Amino acid sequence: MNIKKMMLGALAFLTSLTLAACGSNDSATKSDNWTAYESEKSVTIGFDKTFVPMGFEQTDGSYTGFDIDLANAVFEKYGITVKWQPIDWDLKETELNNGNIDLIWNGYSITDERKEKVLFTNPYMDNQQIIVTKKSSNISQVSDMKDKILGAQAGSSGYSVFESQPAILKDIVQNNDASQYATFNEALIDLKNDRIDGLLIDRVYANYYLQQEGIIADYNIIDAGFENEAFAVGARKSDTTLVENINKAFAELYKEGKFQEISQKWFGEDVATDAVKN
């Protein structure tokens, strides 16, 4: 066999391996994978590691938060370990449908646009979009944002409704757009330093962050005027058994009082939706 034939043979072999790997991954993203999660005793959840108090990284590198505790409790019922995978939140659905993660679970709001890409569990917590401003700015209502600079997280549900319902906020802010940030942390730093005038953000994040920083008295929390949202877990559309079992675990955890225990730990109240309670 000459060198040319050897090289062609090696190339064909490598190509077959690549196609096989791609085919395997493609199959996994189009299948109901519950038996695989059970046999491997592992599921990978994608999250934004800066989203306090839902799921975030501590100074020692470990992850904590309401969603972290809740997800771990859910999968403990099935003997499955959660692998937490930090992701670029703007690419979350891509990461899910490419098979890099199995679930999106991190203050993930249900929207019509997202329903086209993922299969949602029952909602487990309600949320609201608000605008945070400095009290020193004299911006205390939505109309005060006229010609002001607004910030928002790229890929967030807040930015999505900002775009889809322009009459509420987009049409009045400077340049009819919002400065987009990779994380809320970056946006809050710019708000503190007067590089933006207001920040469109999840109420749950803003309340926790400002209280933890001890600066909540220095900021206004303004209802942005959008409809309230609901947090749920996002799965691939083929993973129906996974979604059914998460819903089942939600209900069981609530009946056992574990859901309320986790809720009290992070919010000081029971945040469960009726879908969880019933």
Cite the ranges covered by each PLM segment.
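Extended ligand-binding regions for polar small-molecule ligands
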Residues: 23, 68-77, 143, 147-149, ...
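Periplasmic-binding protein-like
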Residues: 49, 126-133, 211-248, 267-278
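C-terminal motif of bacterial Sec signal peptides marking the signal peptidase cleavage site
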Residues: 18-21
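Ligand-binding cleft/hinge of the Venus flytrap
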Residues: 57, 71-79, 158-180, 210-215
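Extracytoplasmic small-molecule ligand-binding "clamshell" domains
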Residues: 28-107, 256
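Short helix-initiation/N-cap motifs at beta->coil->alpha
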Residues: 83-94, 177-190, 229
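Acidic, polar ligand-binding/catalytic clefts
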Residues: 72, 81-144
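A ligand-binding cleft/hinge motif common to bilobed small-molecule-binding domains
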Residues: 91, 108-116, 161-164, 189-193, ...
